Amino acid sequence: AFYRAAKKADSDLSQYADVDSCAKLWLINELGKNWDSGVSSVYFVYKQDSDGNYKFFGSPVWDYDNALGNAAGSAWDLQNFGVKDYTQYSGWWCRFKDRQKRSQNSSNIINNISRNTQVNKAAVNI
């Protein structure tokens, strides 16, 4: 249910997840240009919130060996390590450059969460 809700920009993600922690997880991975984020190196913790409801929480970030400018390739293209062009990244940079279609990877949970209306509203307040 959480994954299906994350795939819809207008879904009520707060039923399944702590929106603030999802927004923080998205922002720190986007700002850190974490290449692995959302595909293989992201964790969510399932625990009780302050109201006693069980929800998914964005967990601490990890696996930053390919982040912060250390990788510029795609998939397993190991010959493209080292940043050559910061504009090739997806997420906020593509939206800033009005090229959102490049970030439409439906298997990337962080890309899905980044398009959620609730997460975008929460991100402004962080």
Provide a role label for each language-model segment.
Residues A1-S103, S107, K121-V124:
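Conserved kinase catalytic-core segment
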Residues I113-K121:
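C-terminal substrate/ligand-recognition segments
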